[in-house]
């Protein structure tokens, strides 16, 4: 299975495509889209073009995106939301189911520490995947893809026609057996 992880941003958009065969993880492609010092609409357009080309080239079957972290500035959250919208649109245009994960969930799945810093994320990308990301955006995108692969059995798409069915299937996997805690039916 090949998964695309996206760390959205309007100045730098990290991407990581990771393939899993059995227990083995392989980086198919990773990097950072840097649209340059352009007006916002043009930067978002360049990111969309870059993601479209990446999806056509790498052919992932699912996409995963980091959910919005508002931080200290409402303006930053709005700008991040615009970049996320572009990432979601690129995946939707390609017909990919999209899954979202909180930053702390990604860090926990990738490093074992939900509050991991940039250095720890970069080190884990090198150790776990043999990747050598130059920027934390790239390492974060790889981590998002790995998080999705690790959580996939219980993941529910963020939107789309399959969301309700996937949610029911995931809930069924979480249900306890027909026996109660005393072992009686």
UniProtKB/Swiss-Prot annotation:
Instruction: Give the location in the cell.
Output: Cytoplasm
As one GO molecular function, the record gives: crossover junction DNA endonuclease activity
Keyword list (alphabetical) reads:
Cytoplasm, DNA damage, DNA recombination, DNA repair, DNA-binding, Endonuclease, Hydrolase, Magnesium, Metal-binding, Nuclease
Q: Which EC numbers characterise this protein's activity in its record?
A: 3.1.21.10
- Which segments cross the bilayer? none
Q: What does this protein do?
A: The RuvA-RuvB-RuvC complex processes Holliday junction (HJ) DNA during genetic recombination and DNA repair. Endonuclease that resolves HJ intermediates. Cleaves cruciform DNA by making single-stranded nicks across the HJ at symmetrical positions within the homologous arms, yielding a 5'-phosphate and a 3'-hydroxyl group; requires a central core of homology in the junction. The consensus cleavage sequence is 5'-(A/T)TT(C/G)-3'. Cleavage occurs on the 3'-side of the TT dinucleotide at the point of strand exchange.
Assembly, in brief, is: Homodimer which binds Holliday junction (HJ) DNA. The HJ becomes 2-fold symmetrical on binding to RuvC with unstacked arms; it has a different conformation from HJ DNA in complex with RuvA. In the full resolvosome a probable DNA-RuvA(4)-RuvB(12)-RuvC(2) complex forms which resolves the HJ.
Protein name from the UniProt record: Crossover junction endodeoxyribonuclease RuvC
Q: Which organism is it from?
A: Anaeromyxobacter sp. (strain K)
